[in-house]
Structure formats: C-alpha cells, structure tokens
C-alpha cells in the first residue's frame, strides 16, 4: 500500500543548505568522514573555539614587539706561538749569583758600564758588608776536615783558598768604611768592630808560617782603628769615643788578638785622656768663675743652710 503512494518532491530551496562549499574536497577518500563519532570528540575544541581563544595577533591594539637579539661577545684569539721572555720576567727568575755573574761579564765586555753600575747601585751598609764576610767565614769553616788535627798542615792546605778569599774581601771592604770615604764615624767604628771579630775566628795553625796571614790582617785592622779614632777626636770633641764604650770594646779585641791591636788602644787612651783632662779643667775653671761671680754679686752662701748654736 505504501509503495503505491508517491514520494512528494523536495522543494528546491532545501538543496541550498545541503550544497557543499567548493573549497572543500568532495573526495570520499577522507577517512575522517567515514569515521564514527566517539564520546571524546565532544571534548575536543572546535575550529570556532580555537579561533576565538587565539590571541589577536593581527589586531592593531596588540602590535608585536621584537625582542633584542642576544649580544655575542667575540673575543680575539691570537695565534699561540713561542716567544722569548721579557727582560723583567727574565730577571725575576735569576738568583743573586746569576745576576752578579751577568753584571760582572757585562762590565768586563763594556768597561764604560762599570762606572754607571757603581753610581746606580745603593751604597753598601755595614750589615750587608759583614754578611758577605760572614759568608766567606762560613765557607772556610765548612771546608775544615772533620776528625784528626784541625790545625795541621793538611787542614791548612784544605782551607787555604778560602782564607785567601776572606782576606781579599776584608781588604776590599775595609777602605770603603774609612774616612774620608765614610763621613760617619759611628758607621766606621761599627764596621771595624764586626770586621775585627771575623779576624778573631780565623783558625790558628801549628806551623807559625801559616799564621802570618792572620797577623798581617791584625796589623791592617790596627791601622784602620787608629785612623778612625783620630778622625773621631776631631769631630765633636770625640764624644762618640768617650760615651760609646769603645775603650772597653777595643781593649777586649786587643786581648783576644794577643796584643796585636795595642797601638790602637794607646791611641784611644791618649785621646780619651786628653778629653778627660780638658773636661776636668773646664769644670774646675767653671767652678772658680762661679764662686767669683757669687762673691762679687753678694749671693755666695745664700743657698746654704744657716747653722744655729755653737760651731
């Protein structure tokens, strides 16, 4: 019965809503078109929601800002190659002996540099000069053979060169600290005190001939003491000799040297005796003149206590 009823025709305006957009593909090969709808598809955002949630990048109110590009600091990388040390760094690696050897060789090759080095170098002090002499003394003591007789001819032959080195250095340093090259008497006296002590430490040998070098050193040191004592007596009335205790120091040196410095002791005694007599006469003359002035002025005895009663 139903088949006999004709199907009414669909109005034409219904076809306009079912017309597909030409931009969409009519291909039936798209698998998503035949895929069944699942429950999780309801929770997926649609194209409309995505477009609404997207930031309005094309809006004129929100113009995009360009971030500054990170700065790239380029460091220069020089080519690594070998080169010699600078003079300042080279001198830092040298010890005292090496520097001394270099200066000596340069002065030997170029004599005009010797005077410049002497003028540029600082003046040696008493402590530095005595330190050099003590170094020679230490080298001498370490060369003495252990065991046996330390004053024998064998021991002397072992240390003879060290004795020569010490005495040569002593003869070079001593004139440097004597007037007129040294203007300070106290500096000269301090050097002579230390240098004489170094001579005391020279060994005595069994053979008298081997002791001539030490005796000659005492004679030269006695002459140096006499020169400085006379110069000190001319300056300031010899006050440094009188109040410096040098009479006791020189007397002790003479006793240790076995009387080799007796001439220097006599010179010092004569200077101290002259200064003592001068001080005594000055004090006596001063007392006499003082009493005379008090008598003339009538003030003599004013400061003395007055005695009452029988004398």
UniProtKB/Swiss-Prot annotation:
One of its GO terms (cellular component) is cytoplasm. Residues 1-81 are annotated as: Disordered. Pfam families: Cut8. The keyword Cytoplasm applies. Residues 21-32, 53-64 have a biased composition (Low complexity). Keywords: Cytoplasm, Nucleus, Protein transport, Transport. Residues 38-51 have a biased composition (Basic and acidic residues). It is found in: Cytoplasm; Nucleus. One of its GO terms (molecular function) is proteasome binding. GO terms for biological process: nuclear protein quality control by the ubiquitin-proteasome system; proteasome localization; protein transport. Involved in ubiquitin-mediated protein degradation. Regulatory factor in the ubiquitin/proteasome pathway that controls the turnover of proteasome substrates. Targets proteasomes to the nucleus and facilitates the degradation of nuclear proteins. Binds the proteasome. Belongs to the cut8/STS1 family. This is Tethering factor for nuclear proteasome STS1. The lineage of its organism: Eukaryota, Fungi, Dikarya, Ascomycota, Pezizomycotina.
């Amino acid at each position: 019965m139903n088949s006999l009823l004709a199907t009414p025709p669909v109005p034409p305006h219904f076809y306009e809503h079912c017309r597909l957009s030409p931009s969409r593909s009519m291909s039936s090969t798209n698998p998503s078109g035949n895929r069944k709808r699942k429950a999780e598809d309801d929770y997926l955002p649609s194209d409309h929601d995505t477009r609404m949630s997207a930031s309005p990048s094309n809006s004129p109110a929100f113009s995009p800002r360009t971030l500054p590009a990170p700065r790239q600091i380029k460091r220069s990388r020089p080519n690594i190659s070998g080169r010699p040390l600078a003079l300042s760094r080279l001198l830092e690696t040298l010890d005292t002996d090496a520097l001394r050897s270099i200066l000596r060789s340069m002065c030997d090759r170029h004599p005009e540099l010797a005077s410049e080095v002497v003028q540029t170098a600082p003046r040696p002090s008493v402590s530095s000069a005595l330190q050099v002499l003590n170094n020679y003394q230490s080298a001498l003591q370490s060369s003495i053979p252990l065991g046996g007789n330390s004053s024998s001819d064998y021991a002397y032959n072992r240390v003879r060169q060290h004795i020569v080195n010490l005495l040569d250095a002593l003869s070079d340093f001593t004139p440097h600290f004597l007037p007129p090259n040294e203007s300070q008497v106290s500096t000269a006296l301090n050097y002579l005190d230390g240098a004489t002590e170094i001579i005391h430490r020279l060994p005595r040998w069994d053979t008298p001939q081997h002791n001539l070098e030490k005796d000659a050193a005492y004679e030269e040191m006695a002459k140096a003491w006499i020169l400085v004592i006379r110069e000190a007596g001319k300056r300031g009335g010899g006050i440094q000799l009188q109040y410096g205790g040098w009479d006791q120091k020189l007397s002790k040196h003479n006793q240790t040297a076995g009387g080799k410095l007796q001439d220097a002791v006599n010179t010092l005694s004569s200077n101290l005796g002259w200064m003592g007599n001068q001080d005594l006469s000055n004090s006596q003359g001063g007392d006499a003149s003082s009493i005379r002035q008090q008598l003339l002025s009538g003030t003599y005895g004013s400061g003395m206590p007055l005695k009452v009663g029988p004398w």
